[in-house]
Each structure stands twice: as C-alpha cells, then as structure tokens.
Amino acid sequence: MAKGQSLQDPYLNALRRERIPVSIYLVNGIKLQGQIESFDQFVILLKNTVNQMVYKHAISTVVPARSVSHHNNNHHTTPTEAVENVETQAE
C-alpha cells in the first residue's frame, strides 16, 4: 500500500460508511455533490440522483458536509479543517 493510501482509504471509507454527503471539486472547477457509494485506487463512485464514476486524478478537493470520525488519533475533521488542510498542502 502506498504511503498516500494510508490516509486516503480510511478517510473515504468513513465518508462511505457514515453516508456523509460530500462536495467533490474537480480540477476544472466543477462541483459534484452526493454520497460516496464506493471507491478503489483510481475512482470514486458518487451517488446522488444518478451514480457518477469520478476519476481520482480529476479531483481537487473532497469536502464533507459534517465532521468525519475516521480513526486518525481520534481526530475529527470538520469541513473547514479539510479545506484548510488542502490549502496548507498547496503552499
């Protein structure tokens, strides 16, 4: 398992398991909304009124509608923190 997967998979799995609505921003600026139905190494299946298969390489940011209780030192990530983390990584 790649180093990046060790954070990505548990985070996406928590979003899927808890059925947390997400906004997914693509690199071209398009915003998609829905719930994560499933995911693998390359794609996320997003469910709303229809199912959409979104390629991860096209995703800029994933923003949950509420806190995510993934098991990363018992830290709950809020939507604001998620955006701040992305902005910090971009600098």
UniProtKB/Swiss-Prot annotation:
Homohexamer. HAMAP family: Hfq (MF_00436). One of its GO terms (molecular function) is RNA binding. Residues 9-68 form the Sm domain. It comes from Haemophilus influenzae (strain PittEE). This is RNA-binding protein Hfq. GO terms for biological process: regulation of DNA-templated transcription; regulation of RNA stability; regulation of translation, ncRNA-mediated. RNA chaperone that binds small regulatory RNA (sRNAs) and mRNAs to facilitate mRNA translational regulation in response to envelope stress, environmental stress and changes in metabolite concentrations. Also binds with high specificity to tRNAs. Gene3D superfamilies: 2.30.30.100. GO terms for cellular component: cytosol. NCBIfam families: Hfq (TIGR02383), PRK00395.1 (NF001602).
